[in-house]
Structure formats: C-alpha cells, structure tokens
Design a protein with these regions (language model features):
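Substrate-binding pocket helix/loop in short-chain dehydrogenase/reductase
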Residues: 95-96, 100-108, 199, 203
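Alpha-helical segment proximal to the catalytic Tyr-Lys
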Residues: 124-125, 166-170, 231
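Short, small/polar-rich loop/turn modules that mediate ligand/substrate recognition or access, typified
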Residues: 85, 169, 174, 233-235
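Conserved glycine-rich cofactor-binding loop
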Residues: 8, 15-16
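Active-site loop-to-helix junction immediately N-terminal to the catalytic Tyr of the SDR YXXXK motif
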Residues: 99, 143-152, 163, 191
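Active-site helix of classical SDR
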Residues: 119, 153, 161
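Short C-terminal tail/terminal secondary-structure segment
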Residues: 142, 223, 234-247
Length: 247
C-alpha cells in the first residue's frame, strides 16, 4: 500500500527544489498535496509537473493573511490536515558586519516566524493527529561563516520542535526536523551565481560521501517522517547531508 494513502498534506515552498520533489513523492505515495509559493508562474509549472492530486495556493509564509487563506482552502476542500512540511525558506549569505536590520528581519520573518505561524495555524485542522516536518539545516551546528542569520533561524526551528514534541504529543501530533546538506536546488545556484560550480567542488571536499545531494533524497526522508512507518519517532533532527554534521 502507498505510504501516504489518503493523507492530506501541505508543503510550503512547494514549487521548486526540495519542496517540489517532495510534493511529487507525496502524490506518488497516495497523498493529496497543497503547495505554496510566492510566484504564480512557478506554481503553475509545478502543478503541471505533479499532474494530479494537487492544489497550488500562491502566498508568502511571512504574511499571516496568506497563511489564513492557505488553511481556509485546505479546510474548504478537504476538511482536515494530516501532514505539514514547512519547507519555505530563504538564504542570503552575509558576514555579521554586513547584516542590515532589513536583512535580519526578512530572514527571521520567513525562516522562523513564518514557520512558527504556519504550524500554529495548521493545528485546528489536525484534529486526528498528524506529522509536522520542518526544513532545517546543519549550518547552525557547524558554525559556518557568512551564515549568522540563516543559521540562527535554523537553530530556532530545532528549539521549536523540542517544545512541540512535548506540547503536541497528547494530541497525537509528531514534530521533527529534516536538515539537508548541500542539495542540487535553485537556492544553491542563487547563493553563488557564477561561482556555483566552484562552490560545489569545495562542498564535495567537506562531505564524507563526496557529492552534492539530490532533492529526491530529501523527499524520501520526508515521506518516512510523514508516514505511519515513523509513528514512534518525534523530536528528532534527521540530517540528510552525506555525513557533514556527523564528522
């Protein structure tokens, strides 16, 4: 039987990269997926690629009205929610001395505040329990220069999940983090531009498995944490990074 048969799922940041790969896998495993993204053209393309059992809702996770509209759509169409993959996020490398208040606020608004309220507003639809998955990163564990704000937001997500593990257990809701390493996505390209190939080669020297990951490999981990196969797993941070944070 498909791992997610009949499950109603939401994937924020579901129009490209890890989010899109996960949406495709969720549908393949029997789920109905609501995906979000800021750009309607990318959402339309994603829906065409996914092909079935998908609804796209344009919006920005840092905008609480957009989150309300998302969950209203879920409630109207399906009446419940089984899985939330809070995947939307941004990354803009900057050294501490170059971080402006605007950069700081934007990064935390999307990566931390947006995730927090995406979860809060999902709870009324998880009446029968469910699985919450946050998209984290090993950056906060490794202490990598140029990522003080991004790493800070991902550390916040780890803290959220520790709290929610205890807070939501009585409601049958599990909460976990997936922490991807360097993955072949538009975000990776966007960080380094014309230096992307050189940075990929540098990353490979830091990764014990010696290669950049694929979005589909993160999607496989998300399927596991979304499914009943992980029914006794909550509160973890699952690295999908080729061994980066382990050594």
């Amino acid at each position: 039987m498909p791992a997610l048969k009949g499950k109603i799922t939401v994937i924020t940041g579901g129009s490209t990269g890890i989010g899109l790969a996960t949406a495709k896998r969720f549908v393949k495993e029997g789920a109905y997926v609501f995906i979000t993204g800021r750009r309607q053209a990318e959402l339309d393309k994603a829906v065409a690629e996914i092909g079935r059992n998908v609804t796209a809702v344009q919006g920005d996770v840092s905008n609480l009205d957009d989150l309300d509209r998302l969950y209203k759509e879920v409630e109207t169409k399906k009446g419940k929610l089984d899985v939330l993959f809070a995947n939307a996020g941004i990354v803009e490398p900057k050294p501490t001395a170059a971080v402006s208040p605007e950069h700081y606020d934007k990064t935390f608004d999307v990566n931390a505040r947006g995730v927090f309220f995406a979860v809060q507003k999902a709870l009324p639809l998880m009446k029968d329990g469910g699985s919450i998955i946050l998209s984290g990163s090993g950056v906060w564990q490794k202490g990598i220069p140029m990522y003080p704000t991004y790493g800070g937001t991902k550390a916040a997500l780890r803290s959220f999940v520790r709290t929610w593990t205890a807070e939501f257990a009585g409601k049958g809701i599990r909460a976990n983090v997936i922490s991807p390493g360097p993955i072949e996505t538009p975000i990776l390209e966007g960080q380094f531009g014309e230096n992307t190939d050189a940075m990929k080669e540098r990353f490979k020297t830091m990764i014990p498995m010696g290669r950049i990951g694929k979005p589909e490999e993160v999607a496989s981990a998300a399927v596991f944490l979304a499914s009943d196969e992980s029914s006794y797993i909550t509160g973890i941070d699952l690295p999908v990074d080729g061994g980066v944070v382990a050594v």
